[in-house]
């Protein structure tokens, strides 16, 4: 795995200076702009394009808290996150997932827009709490806990996407 933190000359930390990230991105994109390679060989142009794609990929990783956490864990442990592998050891969270799914299904079936807004706020709050928890786990180098929290964040992200879908559907009525 390429190290997006190194590419952007940033410390390997979960909390990022967003202004510095933006500044570094603009500087890298400016340096790799196709106009700078107009008189270069085809190979140099291709390499600049590849490097530009790497910069864009790295930016996506650094901007997404889940991908950023996966990256930090991988850089420190050498282990890549297997997103297909589901953790069944976290029974309390599995029960929470089932409860949330049932609640969302009920909201959709009854077309309860107010209920959806309340539910959405609850999930947003849970997301913020998990972001704070993963930040702490990563700073303490508690990789197992960080993986567990990141799995929870992955579920919450999917749930938030589902909430948006239902929001759009109910808005069309």
Curated annotation (Swiss-Prot):
A GO cellular component annotation in the UniProt record: iron-sulfur cluster transfer complex
Q: Name one GO molecular function term.
A: ATPase activator activity
**Any one of the GO BP annotations:** protein folding
Q: Where is the J domain?
A: 3-75
Q: Which UniProt keywords apply?
A: Chaperone
Pfam families, per the entry: HSCB_C
Write down the SMART domains for this protein, in alphabetical order: DnaJ
> What PANTHER family does UniProt report for this protein, alphabetically?
IRON-SULFUR CLUSTER CO-CHAPERONE PROTEIN HSCB (PTHR14021:SF15)
Q: Which family does it belong to?
A: Belongs to the HscB family.
Could you give the subunit structure recorded for this chain? Interacts with HscA and stimulates its ATPase activity.
Question: What does this gene product do?
Answer: Co-chaperone involved in the maturation of iron-sulfur cluster-containing proteins. Seems to help targeting proteins to be folded toward HscA.
Indicate what this protein is called per its UniProt record.
Answer: Co-chaperone protein HscB homolog
Originating species: Mannheimia succiniciproducens (strain KCTC 0769BP / MBEL55E)
Gene this protein is translated from? hscB
């Amino acid at each position: 795995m390429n190290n997006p933190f190194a590419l952007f000359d940033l410390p390997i930390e979960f909390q990022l200076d967003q202004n510095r990230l933006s500044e570094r991105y603009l500087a890298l994109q400016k340096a790799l702009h196709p106009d700078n390679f107009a008189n270069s060989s085809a190979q140099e142009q291709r390499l600049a394009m590849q490097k530009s794609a790497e910069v864009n990929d790295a930016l996506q990783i650094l901007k997404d808290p889940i991908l950023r956490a996966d990256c930090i864990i991988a850089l420190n442990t050498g282990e890549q996150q297997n997103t297909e592998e589901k953790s069944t050891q976290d029974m309390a969270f599995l029960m929470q997932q089932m409860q949330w799914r049932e609640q969302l299904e009920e909201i959709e079936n009854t077309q309860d827009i107010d209920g959806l807004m309340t539910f959405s706020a609850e999930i947003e709050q849970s997301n913020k709490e998990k972001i704070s928890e993963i930040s702490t786990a990563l700073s303490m180098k508690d990789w197992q806990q960080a993986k567990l929290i990141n799995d929870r964040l992955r579920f919450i992200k999917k749930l938030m996407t589902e909430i948006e879908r239902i929001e759009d559907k109910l808005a069309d009525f």
